[in-house]
A protein has these predicted regions:
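Conserved nucleotide-cofactor-binding alpha/beta core module
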Residues: 1-111
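Active-site capping/gating segments
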Residues: 97-139
Length: 139
């Protein structure tokens, strides 16, 4: 699951490694750009039809079905609701930029209802490719 798909930049990288990517983008402008990128054949993905409230309230989507969740863009808080609703053994990767984590890529691994947090690296656009190459990342 990719949250905040934007133009589809990271989606296009991930689509090289997975045949099935579900994406969430709630900005109407970005949704149209994302759809245009799919139509141009830049990547293959499924854009889920959700509002931001439906997503965060876990109404139309069951986060538990995903084992790998990537959140694009910087968060100023840890994604507590997503972690809480994720299934055991789910991995959640995001960038957090606040006073505790200055623009860090953070990975959460949920085990037996608890979440383990790992600070991976400084956030940079080339990092996702390095991460996908070095980690067993199956969607």
């Amino acid at each position: 699951l990719e949250i905040g798909s934007g133009f589809g930049t990271s989606t296009s990288i991930m689509s090289e490694f997975s045949s099935n990517i579900d994406c969430v983008e709630t900005s109407k402008q970005m949704t149209q750009v994302f759809k245009d990128s799919m139509e141009e054949g830049l990547f293959n993905a499924s854009l889920l039809d959700l509002s931001i409230d439906e997503f965060f309230n876990n109404k139309k989507i069951k986060i538990q079905k995903y084992q790998k969740i990537i959140i694009n863009g910087s968060l100023d808080e840890e994604p507590i609701d997503i972690i809480k609703n994720a299934s055991d053994n789910a991995e959640i990767v995001c960038i957090i930029d606040n006073k505790n984590f200055k623009h860090k890529i953070v990975k959460y691994l949920k085990v037996e209802g608890n979440s383990n947090r790992f600070i991976i690296d400084e956030a940079s656009s080339s990092y996702i490719y390095k991460y996908v190459q070095s980690e067993p990342f199956v969607f």
